[in-house]
Swiss-Prot record:
Its EC number is 3.4.23.-. Belongs to the peptidase A1 family. It comes from the Eukaryota. The lineage of its organism: Eukaryota, Metazoa, Chordata, Craniata, Vertebrata. This is Pepsin-3. Disulfide bonds: none annotated. Keywords: Aspartyl protease, Hydrolase, Protease, Zymogen.
Length: 60
């Protein structure tokens, strides 16, 4: 399955243009320091997301 992606400004970039800075600290690292050395990539960092794709499941 191929999902066409479109590029947008990330939420972090949009807020930076307005003079608002978001911290880069991952909450998992704050409460579980052992995660800082793990080789995982978290997909829940929406502030840095710049590609979006529309997905529909089933028929309406």
């Amino acid at each position: 399955i191929n999902v066409p992606l479109t590029r947008h400004k990330s939420m972090r970039e949009s807020l930076r243009e307005k003079g608002i800075e978001l911290p880069y600290q991952d909450p998992a690292i704050k409460y579980r320091p052992e995660f800082a050395t793990a080789n995982y990539m978290y997909i829940n960092q929406y502030a840095d997301t710049i590609y979006y794709g529309a997905i529909s499941i089933g028929t309406p």
